[in-house]
Amino acid sequence: MNITTFDAFSRLSINDISRISKFLYDHSGEFKDSKSAIRKSIMYAAKEVPGLGGYVFIMENKGEILGAIVVNRTGMNEYLAENILVYVAVKDAYRGKGIAQKLLSHTIKYCKGDIAIHINKDNPVIELFKKQGFKSRNIEMRLER
């Protein structure tokens, strides 16, 4: 099993973007966003759309994606985190085997600056983030339009 890191310099192909988008959608459980939203976050990370870019981390075994994380850079520091971890998912058959922990450790080492995550308060993956040093600092309130 190896972790591959994609950013603006190690480009994602259109096929990679589709494959990773599908994986995240299929394995995000009950807390998933739309396919379109997931694809947009990957396109932003890959700098295929205007923005600061970010990172996509995937763990694979013989070409099969076992887990993936998407991080978007915010360009902010001191007052908000420089990075936001947008998506994390592990294939159902591999949950509980340390895949998410390894991916998250790699992500933390790779990303410069603070990392934030918006997560549903009922999502059990919160415990993984707490073990890695994440703290609940704020609540998000959103006016949806």
What positions do the PLM features span?
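A short beta-loop-alpha structural element at the N-terminal edge
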Residues: 1-22
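Conserved acetyl-CoA binding element of GNAT-fold acetyltransferases
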Residues: 79-92, 118, 139-142
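Conserved acetyl-CoA-binding loop of GNAT-fold acetyltransferases
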Residues: 130-140
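A short helix-loop-beta-strand connector motif used in the catalytic cores of GNAT acetyltransferases and
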Residues: 46-58
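Conserved beta-strand in the GNAT
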Residues: 58, 64-73, 84, 89
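Conserved acetyl-CoA-binding loop-helix of GNAT-fold acetyltransferases
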Residues: 90, 96-109, 131
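Conserved GNAT-fold acetyl-CoA-binding loop/helix
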Residues: 14, 22-45
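Conserved GNAT acetyl-CoA-binding A-motif
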Residues: 111-121
